[in-house]
C-alpha cells in the first residue's frame, strides 16, 4: 500500500506538473508616467527548478477597482522573463496591483496567480491632499462621506473647482464645495469592491488631479474562524484549536477573548499572537457547547460558537521538540484501540516523505528536522478506503536547503556620480558554489524603501503552497532562518494546502490539466463552406500573412473545418491578414477566428505593502526627473497653452454629454489594445468575458455609427479604426435610446463612418492584431566615465538607481557588476532575488552609502 501511495503521487506530478511564479519589481511605488520594471521567476512547483516550459508570462496592471488597465506578454530571453509595465502620464493616483500568470496556471484558478501591490501617485499628490471621513449608519446600510482638500506644505484648506466624484453605479457626478469648505455624500453601503472605491478628480490653480480612494468597511466588523488541530475535535481529551481573526477589510484583527460554557462560566483566556492568529486548548464531552467571547482593539465584543467535540473521532496532532517533529494520533476517549486501519502520508509539494500504515502501538511518529525538506509539509491521515480523515500542516526549515548569499561593494562609501563595483557570492550551506541567476534592484532609501511584506523566500517556500490570502508573508522570514518564526505554526493550523486534490491522488484518480502549457503563438479558427457557408469545410486552405513583420504561413483545415497555426511568435502590434479559400481557390467561404481569451478578474484579498513612507517627497523628486526626461506634463495647465481642458470631454455626437465617459482616438491609442474586446475590457465599469460584454452585470446596447450591433460582431472592427467611444449610464442611455438601452449603452463612432470596416472586408478574410511579446528594453543607468559627463549640469534624480534582471553567477558562484551613483547623498537599498539552477532560493539585501 505504501508503495502504491508514493506511485500515485509520482503519477500525479507527471500527468499534471504545476508552476510557481514570483515577480520582483524595481521598487514599491511610482509616479504617473514611470515604467514598472519587473522580473518573473517561473519554477516547477515541486522541485523549484527554473522552468520555461510555458513560453509566455502575462503581466497585467489592475486599478484599485480591479479593472484591467494594461497587459503585456513576456517571453524568456536566455531563460529570463523580464519586462516593464508602462503607466500613463494621466493615470489616477491610487493603490494598484500587478497580476502575473501563465496560460497553464489557469488550470488551477486565479488563486495561483501572483499579485503584487504597487502605489502610483501623480505630482499633485505631493502638493495637495484629499481628506475623507467615512461614517456608517447604525444599521450599516448607508455610509456618510465628508471630503475636503488641503495644501500639504501649509496645511491650509483649498477650494478646487470642477470636482467630479464617482457614484455607486460608477457614473461621474459634479459636486460643489459647501460653505464649510467640505463636500458631503451619502450612499448605500458598497456591495462589492468596484463600488468600494471613490474616484475623485478636480482642478486647482490650473492643474488637474485625479485619484482613487478606498471606502473602508465599518470599524466594528470582524470575524473569527476556529479550526481544531487536524480538522477534528475528539471528545474527552485536551485539544488545540487554532483561530484567525480578520476585519471586514480582510486583514488581521488583534483580539483577546475568553471561553465560556452554556452557563456563562469562564473556562480559559486567550489572545492573538501574530496577525490575528492564536490558539487555545479545550476539553469537552459530546453534547457540550462552548463559546468564545472575543473583543477587538475598538472594544467591540462578539460571541462565536466553538467547534463541537465528537465521539469515535481521530485527529492528527503535530509539535516540534527541539529539532524533532512529532506527529501524534489523538483519539476520543471512547476509542481504547483502533478497530480499523489508518495510513499516515507525509509529503512536501507532492514529494512523498513517508507513507505507512499507522502503528497502533506507537503514540507518535518522529521525524528529524534535517530529514525533512524546507517548505510546507502536509501530514494526511487516511482510512482503509483512502479517504482523508485528518490533515495537519507544518513548516520546516532545513539548513541544507538554504543558500548563503553575500553581497559586497569594493568600498564602504562612495561619492556622487562615482562607479560602484559590486560582488555577489552564492553557495550552499557547506560553502560549495552554486550556479543561478538573479535580479537586483538598487533604490534611494531617502525616496522609498523596499517592500518588506513579500519576497521570493516567502512566496516560493510558503505563500504559493497555502490556501487563502497570507498577510505579510515575509514577516515569517526575518532574522535567523534556522529558528522558525513562532507565528508559522499558527499559520499552519489556520491555512490549508492548496495544490493537488489529495483525496483523488490517494485513490489513484489523478487530475489532468484542461489547458496545456503555451509553447508558441497561435492563430486558430474555423472555415465554413457550402451554399450558405454554414458547414465546416474540411481540407480547405488557409493562408496567413503578417503585414509589418516577416512572417507567412499556410495550412489546411481538419475534418471539423478547424485550423490552428502554431510554432511562431511575433512582437506586439503585428497585424495579420488571414484568408480562407475553397479547394479550387475560390473565396465563397466564411472564415471565423478564435478570439484570444484571458482570465476574468475577481475581487482580490487585500495585499500588504511597505516602504512608502515619505511618498510625497519622493513624488516631487520623481516628477522633476520625469520632466527632465520627457518635458512638461499635460496636467500642468497653467504653464502650457491648452485650448480644451482634459477634465471634461464632450463627444462629436449630437446627443453627447459631459456626464458620459468619453474615450477619444488618442485615449484608445494609449491602450495598445489589439481588438475591440480587449479595448472595452480596459474601460472601467465594462466587463468582457470572451465576446460577452456587460455593464453592472447586464448587457448594454451597443451602437456602431448609430447602427445597433451584436457584441459577437465587434471582432470586425479594429481599435485603430475607432474615432471615439462614449459610455452612457443606464439613465442617460434610456433617455436617448429608449427601452433597448435600459442597461446603459456603448456608442462607438468609427473614423470612416462605415462601421470601421474599410471597403467591407470579405467573408473569407480577417485582419487581426493579437497580443504579441514585448520587445526587450534595457533599464537606463547613466555612466560618468569622463570629466565632461561628471560635470554635466543636468541633475541625476534617479529613484531607482540600478535595475538589472539578468545577472548570472559563474562556475565559482560569484557575479560582479557595476553602476554609477546619482546626485543625492543617501543610503541605497539593495534587494537581490533569484533561483539557483537546482531550485534553491537566492535572496539577500544590502546597503550602499553615498556621501
Annotate each predicted stretch with a short phrase.
Residues 81-87:
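Ligand-binding face of N-terminal immunoglobulin V-set domains in extracellular IgSF glycoproteins
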Residues 12-16, 27, 31, 52, ...:
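Surface-exposed, low-complexity/disordered segments
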Residues 73-76, 174-180, 268-274, 552-560, ...:
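Short, acidic Ser/Thr/Gly-rich low-complexity loop/linker segments typical of extracellular
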Residues 2-19, 24, 29-31, 35-75, ...:
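Contiguous segments within soluble domain cores/interaction surfaces
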Residues 168-169, 262, 703-706:
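Short strand-turn-strand beta-turns centered on an Asx-Gly dipeptide
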Amino acid at each position: 500500500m505504501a508503495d502504491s501511495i508514493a506511485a500515485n503521487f509520482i503519477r500525479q506530478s507527471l500527468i499534471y506538473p504545476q508552476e510557481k511564479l514570483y515577480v520582483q519589481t524595481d521598487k514599491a511605488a511610482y509616479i504617473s508616467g514611470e515604467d514598472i520594471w519587473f522580473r518573473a521567476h517561473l519554477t516547477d512547483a515541486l522541485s523549484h527548478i527554473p522552468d520555461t516550459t510555458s513560453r509566455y508570462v502575462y503581466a497585467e496592471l489592475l486599478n484599485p477597482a480591479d479593472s484591467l488597465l494594461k497587459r503585456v506578454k513576456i517571453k524568456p530571453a536566455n531563460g529570463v522573463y523580464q519586462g516593464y509595465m508602462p503607466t500613463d502620464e494621466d493615470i489616477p493616483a491610487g493603490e494598484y496591483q500587478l497580476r502575473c500568470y501563465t496560460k497553464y496556471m489557469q488550470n488551477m484558478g486565479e488563486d495561483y496567480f501572483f499579485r503584487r501591490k504597487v502605489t502610483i501617485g501623480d505630482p499633485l499628490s505631493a502638493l495637495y491632499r484629499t481628506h475623507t471621513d467615512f461614517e456608517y449608519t447604525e444599521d450599516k446600510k448607508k455610509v456618510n462621506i465628508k471630503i475636503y482638500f488641503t495644501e500639504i506644505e501649509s496645511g491650509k484648506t483649498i477650494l478646487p473647482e470642477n470636482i467630479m466624484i464617482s457614484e455607486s453605479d460608477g457614473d461621474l457626478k459634479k459636486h460643489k464645495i459647501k460653505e464649510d469648505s467640505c463636500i458631503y455624500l451619502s450612499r448605500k453601503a458598497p456591495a462589492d469592491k468596484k463600488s468600494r472605491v471613490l474616484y475623485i478628480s478636480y482642478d486647482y490653480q490650473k492643474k488637474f488631479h485625479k485619484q482613487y480612494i478606498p471606502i473602508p468597511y465599518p470599524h466594528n466588523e470582524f470575524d473569527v474562524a476556529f479550526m481544531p488541530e487536524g480538522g477534528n475535535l475528539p471528545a474527552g481529551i485536551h485539544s488545540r484549536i487554532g483561530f484567525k481573526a480578520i476585519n471586514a477589510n480582510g486583514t488581521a484583527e488583534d483580539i483577546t477573548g475568553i471561553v465560556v460554557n452554556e452557563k456563562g462560566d469562564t473556562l480559559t483566556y486567550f489572545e492573538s499572537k501574530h496577525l490575528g492568529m492564536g490558539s487555545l486548548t479545550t476539553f469537552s464531552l459530546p453534547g457540550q457547547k462552548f463559546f468564545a467571547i472575543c473583543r477587538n482593539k475598538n472594544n467591540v465584543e462578539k460571541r462565536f460558537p466553538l467547534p463541537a467535540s465528537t465521539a469515535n473521532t481521530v485527529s492528527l496532532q503535530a509539535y516540534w521538540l527541539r529539532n524533532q517533529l512529532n506527529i501524534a494520533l489523538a483519539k476520543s476517549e471512547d476509542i481504547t484501540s483502533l478497530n480499523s486501519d489508518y495510513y499516515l502520508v507525509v509529503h512536501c509539494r507532492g514529494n512523498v516523505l513517508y507513507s505507512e500504515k499507522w502503528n497502533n502501538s506507537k503514540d507518535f511518529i518522529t521525524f528529524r528536522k534535517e530529514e525533512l525538506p524546507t517548505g510546507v509539509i502536509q501530514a494526511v491521515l487516511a482510512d482503509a478506503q483512502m479517504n482523508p480523515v485528518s490533515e495537519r500542516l507544518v513548516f520546516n526549515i532545513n539548513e541544507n536547503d538554504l543558500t548563503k548569499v553575500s553581497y559586497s561593494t569594493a568600498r564602504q562609501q562612495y561619492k556622487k556620480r562615482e562607479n560602484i563595483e559590486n560582488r555577489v557570492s552564492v553557495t550552499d550551506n557547506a560553502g560549495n558554489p552554486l550556479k543561478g541567476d538573479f535580479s537586483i534592484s538598487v533604490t534611494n532609501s531617502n525616496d522609498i524603501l523596499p517592500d518588506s511584506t513579500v519576497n521570493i523566500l516567502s512566496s516560493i517556500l510558503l505563500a504559493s503552497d497555502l490556501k487563502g490570502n497570507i498577510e505579510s508573508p515575509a514577516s515569517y522570514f526575518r532574522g535567523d532562518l534556522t529558528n522558525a518564526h513562532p507565528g508559522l505554526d499558527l499559520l499552519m493550523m489556520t491555512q490549508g494546502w492548496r495544490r493537488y486534490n489529495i483525496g483523488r491522488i490517494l485513490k489513484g484518480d489523478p487530475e489532468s490539466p484542461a489547458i496545456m502549457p503555451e509553447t508558441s503563438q497561435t492563430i486558430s479558427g474555423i472555415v465554413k463552406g457550402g451554399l450558405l457557408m454554414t458547414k465546416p469545410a474540411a481540407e480547405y486552405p488557409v493562408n496567413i500573412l503578417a503585414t509589418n513583420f516577416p512572417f507567412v504561413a499556410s495550412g489546411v483545415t481538419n475534418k471539423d473545418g478547424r485550423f490552428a497555426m502554431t510554432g511562431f511568435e511575433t512582437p506586439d502590434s503585428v497585424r495579420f491578414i488571414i484568408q480562407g479559400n475553397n479547394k479550387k481557390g475560390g473565396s465563397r467561404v466564411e472564415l471565423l477566428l478564435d478570439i484570444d481569451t484571458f482570465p476574468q478578474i475577481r475581487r482580490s484579498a487585500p495585499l500588504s505593502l511597505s516602504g512608502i513612507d515619505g511618498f510625497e517627497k519622493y513624488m516631487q523628486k520623481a516628477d522633476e526627473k520625469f520632466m527632465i526626461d520627457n518635458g512638461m506634463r499635460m496636467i500642468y495647465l497653467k504653464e502650457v497653452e491648452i485650448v480644451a481642458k482634459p477634465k471634461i470631454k464632450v463627444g462629436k455626437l449630437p446627443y453627447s454629454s459631459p456626464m458620459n465617459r468619453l474615450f477619444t482616438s488618442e485615449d484608445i491609442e494609449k491602450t495598445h489594445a489589439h481588438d475591440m474586446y480587449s479595448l472595452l475590457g480596459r474601460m472601467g465599469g465594462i466587463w468582457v468575458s470572451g465576446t460577452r460584454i456587460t455593464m453592472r452585470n447586464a448587457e448594454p446596447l451597443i451602437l456602431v455609427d448609430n447602427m445597433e450591433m451584436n457584441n459577437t460582431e465587434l471582432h470586425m472592427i479594429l481599435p485603430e479604426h475607432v474615432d471615439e467611444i462614449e459610455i452612457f449610464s443606464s439613465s442617460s442611455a434610456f433617455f436617448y435610446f429608449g427601452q433597448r438601452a435600459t442597461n446603459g449603452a456603448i456608442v462607438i463612432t468609427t473614423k470612416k463612418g462605415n462601421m470601421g470596416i474599410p471597403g467591407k472586408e470579405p467573408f473569407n478574410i480577417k485582419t487581426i492584431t493579437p497580443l504579441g511579446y514585448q520587445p526587450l528594453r534595457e533599464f537606463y543607468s547613466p555612466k560618468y566615465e569622463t570629466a565632461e559627463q561628471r560635470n554635466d549640469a543636468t541633475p541625476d534624480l534617479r529613484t531607482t538607481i540600478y535595475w538589472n534582471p539578468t545577472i548570472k553567477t559563474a562556475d565559482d558562484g560569484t557575479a560582479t557588476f557595476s553602476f554609477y551613483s546619482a546626485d543625492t547623498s543617501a543610503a541605497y537599498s539593495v534587494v537581490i532575488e533569484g533561483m539557483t539552477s537546482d531550485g534553491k532560493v537566492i535572496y539577500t539585501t544590502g546597503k550602499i552609502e553615498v556621501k
